[in-house]
Amino acid sequence: MQIQVDTREHKKEWERIRTQFDDIGVKYFRSKMYVGDYQSLDNPRLVIDRKKDLQELCGNVCQQHERFKAELVRAIQQDIKIVILVEHGEDIKTLEDVYFWQNPRKHEIRWKTVNGRKVKTVCSEKAVDGMQLYKSL
């Protein structure tokens, strides 16, 4: 099996994944991909779009919606199936777990000074939580 890896994959993440590929003997090469981050040359109509965690997926679905949607449309037009792989961690094992996920950006409290008084503010009141993300999937 040989894997094509998108050259735009984050350097730090690529180094971690490259080490894993090397450890288990997976052959790979890097080049710019039309959609996604990884694909097997055995099945070029199936690609993997890797997300570091649910916060990255929220950013794609909400803040970068048009770019993310355009990538999905390009895949559909070329009859490419995309698997979105979210490497969130041990607390998310199933799609249903996403529903109960608490976005730390939505609940992070910061103090700022307004007119000489300290005021408590939420880091990002518009941040998407698990229930909203689940419903959009």
Predicted regions and their residues:
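Acidic-basic catalytic patches of nuclease active cores, encompassing PD-(D/E)XK
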Residues: M1-N43
